[in-house]
Structures are given as structure tokens and as C-alpha cells.
């Protein structure tokens, strides 16, 4: 009975029941036992019903409404248990008739206050459980882990239905008020972290852009090699060009003194005259090579000899009977001699020379071979 008294919040001892029976109010006694049955059913269901806060902590979903559990009417065998127990206690006292007015049975005595209705306590519990669900609307890991700590304080509210002097609403409000600054601190921390991340992203993006610009600029502008500055071309006047051409016709190669005299006469530097002569010789050799090839193909070696006199002596009888192959060979020898430009021999040592290419028809000692030429050299005896 003492356990029942602590659970219901009102004294239901033998003395209290006897005093209630002695007052002569069977309806009051019936009401006390009905309230006792309701309290017992509420205790049993509150123990069997899981805590809404524990459901939030473990599952993370909305808890089941405790109102649907506590609003069910008490079972008939628990309600009728009160009069039977009262009958056994009073040793043969008859239970009150069932036709007693319900108003008298539900009115409590001024000395004994009945426990609060389980409906109002369940409504308070539902409102207390609904408050933390609406306070945090995000389902992030930080919010769930942060909500588990303050919501764990709501675990003892599952047994608060049996105790009338317990105030779960005030404790939940105090827990929420203590949890609000924590949420504000977490929000401020997350905002600061986001700002720092954005600033770091901007910095990294800026450095990346600068690096990309440097790479693109290095690709667009390749490394400049150390080149010597190109000299500007000299613009010669007509008078200077005419004098240089006349000098080149006389001499293809100039000595150092002749080059210095010509440069002083034309108001040019020694380097400018030297460069012009080099370019002019290259052009002349190219033109000469082309002309020799054309004349060799045509077979007109006499015109070639007139155009380019050779230091070698050729007899007219040999030139008349020369074919195109021999003329091409002679032109090649002449062209090579012009490139070499051998120095002029001493006048006393100079004598007419005949190239070996041109004496293939002559015998030893300058005598004609077995096949005489069409135009023999005058004064040469014919072979017999």
C-alpha cells in the first residue's frame, strides 16, 4: 500500500480508507477507488510506454503521442477491483449500489486532493516533447548530436505522470532556455567557419588566377633569346652604286688599300664597301654558273670563250671540232679557274698551255693521233 501511495500521490492507507468509510459517503469511497485504478493503470502504461525523448535521441524521428495511450478508459477489471478490495477490507460491508449519482462519486473531500488527470499531464508532456522538435529544424549531424544532450534531461518526464507535484513544463522550458545560447554559439561558429572558408576560397582562386595568367603570359611570350641586333641595311645612292659597279668590272677582288681608297672617295666605311663586294661577287658567280650551263647545252663554246676569256690558249682548229660534252667540260674547268682566281704568272714564265681535256685527239709529243682532225694544224705532216 505504501508503494501505491507513492505512485498515486494521495494517501490510501487503511486509516484513511476507514475514516472515509466512517464518514458515511459510499460515493466518495467509490470515487477514490476509481481514481486509484486510473492512477495504477497510468503508472503501468507510463512504465510500458517509451520516453519520447529517448525516441528522439535514438531514432531522430517524431515521438509517438502519449495522449493516445493515456486517453484510453481504464480496464473494467481494474475499476471493479476497488469496490472488491474495499469489501474485503471492511469485512462484509456491502459495496455501494451502481445507481449512485456520478456527481457525488467524483467530488473529492477537502482533506484529500485527487491526483491530476492524466489527460492534462499527457498534454503537458506532448507540448514539452513538441517544443524541442520545433526548436531545431535541421537534420545535420551537429544538430542531432547537440540536441541529444539537452533532450536527455527530458527522460525522467516519463514517470512524471504519476507524481502530481512534478512540473515537467518548467524544467523543459529551463532546459530550452539553457540550450538556446548553445545553439546561438554553434550558429555563430558555423557562420564564422563559412566566412573563413569563403575567404580562403577567394584567396586560393585569386592565386590560381594569377598563376594561370603567368602561365598564359609565359606561353604567349616565349623566352627572348639574346640575339645580336641586326644591322640596318645601307641605302646607297645612285652615284655610289655606279662607282662600285665600275670598280667591280675592273677588279672582282680589292686589296685593303684599294678598298680604303674607294670607301673614302664614296663617303662610305670600309665595312660597307667590303660587304657590298661580297654580295656582288656572290651574285656574279651565280649568274656565271647559269650562263655556262645554258651555253654548254647550246654547244656554242666560241661565244662562251668570247664572253669569258680564259688564261689558257686554245687553238682554233681544236675549238671547231669540239662537241657539246667537251665544251661542257671546258666550261667547268674555266668556271673552277675563275673561282680559284690564281695569281697571274710572271711574263717571262708565261707560255701557252693546252688543257689535257682538249688534247685527247693528239698523240705523244703534240702529234695528231691515228684519226686526224678535219682541219689539221698547218705545218704538221700527215701520217703516212
UniProtKB/Swiss-Prot annotation:
Keywords: Developmental protein, DNA-binding, Homeobox, Nucleus, Transcription, Transcription regulation
UniProt cross-references to Pfam families, sorted A to Z: Homeodomain
Biased composition (Basic and acidic residues): 177-217
Single GO MF descriptor: RNA polymerase II transcription regulatory region sequence-specific DNA binding
Primary location recorded for the protein, binned into one broad class: nucleus
CDD domains, per database record: homeodomain
Low complexity compositional bias, start-end: 119-134
Entry superkingdom: Eukaryota
SMART domains xref list: HOX
Alphabetical list of PANTHER family matching this protein: HOMEO BOX HB9 LIKE A-RELATED, VENT HOMEOBOX
Function field: Potential regulator of neural basic helix-loop-helix genes. It may down-regulate expression of ASCL1 and, within the thalamus, up-regulate NGN2, thereby regulating distinct patterns of neuronal differentiation.
Family listed: Belongs to the BAR homeobox family.
Name the UniProt record assigns to this protein: BarH-like 2 homeobox protein
Organism listed in the record: Rattus norvegicus
Source organism phylogeny: Eukaryota, Metazoa, Chordata, Craniata, Vertebrata
Amino acid at each position: 500500500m505504501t508503494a501505491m501511495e507513492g505512485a498515486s500521490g494521495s494517501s490510501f492507507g487503511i486509516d484513511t480508507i476507514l475514516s472515509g468509510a466512517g464518514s458515511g459517503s459510499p460515493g466518495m469511497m467509490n470515487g477514490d477507488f476509481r481514481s486509484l485504478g486510473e492512477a495504477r493503470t497510468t503508472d503501468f502504461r507510463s512504465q510500458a510506454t517509451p520516453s519520447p525523448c529517448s525516441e528522439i535521441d535514438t531514432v531522430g524521428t517524431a515521438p509517438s503521442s502519449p495522449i493516445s495511450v493515456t486517453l484510453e478508459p481504464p480496464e473494467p477489471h481494474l475499476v471493479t477491483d476497488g469496490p472488491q478490495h474495499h469489501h474485503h477490507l471492511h469485512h462484509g460491508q456491502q459495496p455501494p449500489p451502481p445507481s449512485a449519482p456520478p456527481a457525488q462519486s467524483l467530488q473529492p473531500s477537502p482533506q484529500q486532493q485527487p491526483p491530476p488527470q492524466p489527460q492534462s499531464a499527457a498534454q503537458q508532456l506532448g507540448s514539452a516533447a513538441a517544443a524541442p522538435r520545433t526548436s531545431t529544424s535541421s537534420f545535420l549531424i551537429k544538430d542531432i548530436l547537440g540536441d541529444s544532450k539537452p533532450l536527455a534531461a527530458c527522460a525522467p518526464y516519463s514517470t512524471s505522470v504519476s507524481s502530481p507535484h512534478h512540473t515537467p513544463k518548467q524544467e523543459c522550458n529551463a532546459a530550452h532556455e539553457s540550450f538556446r545560447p548553445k545553439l546561438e554559439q554553434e550558429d555563430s561558429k558555423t557562420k564564422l567557419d563559412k566566412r573563413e572558408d569563403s575567404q580562403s576560397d577567394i584567396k586560393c582562386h585569386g592565386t590560381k588566377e594569377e598563376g594561370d595568367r603567368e602561365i598564359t603570359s609565359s606561353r604567349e611570350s616565349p623566352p627572348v633569346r639574346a640575339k645580336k641586333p641586326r644591322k640596318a641595311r645601307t641605302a646607297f645612292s645612285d652615284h655610289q652604286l655606279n662607282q662600285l659597279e665600275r670598280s667591280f668590272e675592273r677588279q672582282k677582288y680589292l686589296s685593303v688599300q684599294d678598298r680604303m681608297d674607294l670607301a673614302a672617295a664614296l663617303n662610305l666605311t670600309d665595312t660597307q664597301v667590303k660587304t657590298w663586294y661580297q654580295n656582288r661577287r656572290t651574285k656574279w658567280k651565280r649568274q656565271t654558273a647559269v650562263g655556262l650551263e645554258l651555253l654548254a647545252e647550246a654547244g656554242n663554246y666560241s661565244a662562251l670563250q668570247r664572253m669569258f676569256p680564259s688564261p689558257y690558249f686554245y687553238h682554233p682548229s681544236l675549238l671547231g671540232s669540239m662537241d657539246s660534252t667537251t665544251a661542257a667540260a671546258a666550261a667547268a674547268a674555266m668556271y673552277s679557274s675563275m673561282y680559284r682566281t690564281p695569281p697571274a704568272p710572271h711574263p717571262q714564265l708565261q707560255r701557252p698551255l693546252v688543257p689535257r681535256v682538249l688534247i685527247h685527239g693528239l698523240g705523244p709529243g703534240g702529234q695528231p693521233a691515228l684519226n686526224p682532225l678535219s682541219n689539221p694544224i698547218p705545218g704538221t705532216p700527215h701520217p703516212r
